[in-house]
């Protein structure tokens, strides 16, 4: 159950169990009212937020020296990390607000810190558009966790909201759709008027797993099915639904290519990653992260679907070479042909793979980058050739480069911490 309303932020409904919505004469802006150029950083507003008391002013001049003996403010805690759709930018939700940063070159584009409360657990970008989707979270949420707030940074306020009877787990955006993920249900809305287009029931989905294609025209949406280890693939252009039993264990993570043709999945075991064709559900390739169990934090395809990046709680980011574009289709996941090139190393005992366990005939990662264990990391491919961008929940930012021929350890190109004060950037 969801309700839609225009928002006159900063007065969100303080009751997270409420689904009431006030009527308003204002309408949700059409796409022509938004800045949608994906290659323009100027589409972001530099407007700062006001506090809940609009008449409140500071007694300190901007040119005055810092007041002595003030306690040092500790860095904020990160509640959320996500890349935008083309991995050119990333969003950070903290217990004080949110901030948007550019990957290459690394720089902070803007931040919005709230005076009181401020916890934001979901920040979903729409390429480099001024429109964001926000969900409150943390110990002192800025917005109720059962609401999706549509933020227009050009106006410096929320221009619409979607209310639900349970907490929002995640949000996905396309230029024409808003997808809201709850614990066991997914709602698909039209972007221009927030009209409900479709709803899907899923198995318990506390992580809010959902992926949506970004290609112009037909939309492909992937979400957990109703059974453990099952994924559901919705093809909206052809109005077809495909169910794939991807794993025996529960689904832990998945990712789509931009065009929605390929799907990568990992289970709660975290040892294998499988790549499927979304049209017919066939297994195209299987790669091995390792032999021991791991929690997979992120999967990401390169823009040309030649590489796949995987991050886990083991503190290592792996890059795998994919051969799905060669047309060789895997019918039996236990009989994956090894790639003779250095870009996809496999066991030298591959001649005996019909006899030896599958572990010895597995395809292993081409390149690796080792990080400190204990922090959650997500990874995506950079816009420069053979580069990977890694984000950590501790605020860390790494940009690395891998050798596609020789493989091995990636080289670190740069490191930053996105939680530093704005004067540092």
From Swiss-Prot:
Cellular component terms per the entry's GO annotation: cytosol; nucleus; phagophore assembly site membrane; vacuolar membrane
Its membrane topology: Peripheral membrane protein
Q: Which domain of life is it from?
A: Eukaryota
GO biological process terms, semicolon-separated: autophagy; defense response to fungus; leaf senescence; positive regulation of autophagy; protein transport; response to osmotic stress; response to oxidative stress; response to salt stress
Q: Which SUPFAM superfamilies match?
A: WD40 repeat-like
User: Tissue specificity, please?
Assistant: Expressed in roots, stems, flowers and leaves.
Q: Where is the composition biased (Low complexity)?
A: 1-29, 41-62
Subcellular compartments? Cytoplasm; Nucleus; Preautophagosomal structure membrane; Vacuole membrane
Keywords of this entry = Autophagy, Cytoplasm, Membrane, Nucleus, Protein transport, Repeat, Transport, Vacuole, WD repeat
Briefly explain the null phenotype: Mutant is more sensitive to nutrient deprivation conditions and exhibits an early senescence phenotype. Prevents autophagosome formation during starvation. More sensitive to methyl viologen (oxidative stress) treatment and accumulates a higher level of oxidized proteins compared to wild type. High sensitivity to salt and osmotic/drought stresses.
Q: State the InterPro entries in the record.
A: PROPPIN, WD40/YVTN_repeat-like_dom_sf, WD40_repeat_dom_sf, WD40_rpt
State the residue spans of region: Disordered.
1-76
Which Pfam families does the protein's record reference?
PROPPIN
Induction annotation: By sucrose and nitrogen starvation and during senescence. By methyl viologen. By salt and osmotic stress. By necrotrophic fungal pathogen B.cinerea. Up-regulated in response to both water stress and hydrotropic stimulation.
| Assembly and binders | Component of the PI(3,5)P2 regulatory complex at least composed of ATG18, SAC/FIG4, FAB1 and VAC14. Interacts with WRKY33.
Q: Which family does it belong to?
A: Belongs to the WD repeat PROPPIN family.
Quote the entry's note on domains.
The first protein part may form a beta-propeller domain involved in specific binding to phosphatidylinositol 3,5-bisphosphate (PIP2), leading to the association of the protein to the membrane.
> PANTHER family, per this entry?
WD-REPEAT PROTEIN INTERACTING WITH PHOSPHOINOSIDES WIPI -RELATED
The protein's name in its UniProt record: Autophagy-related protein 18a
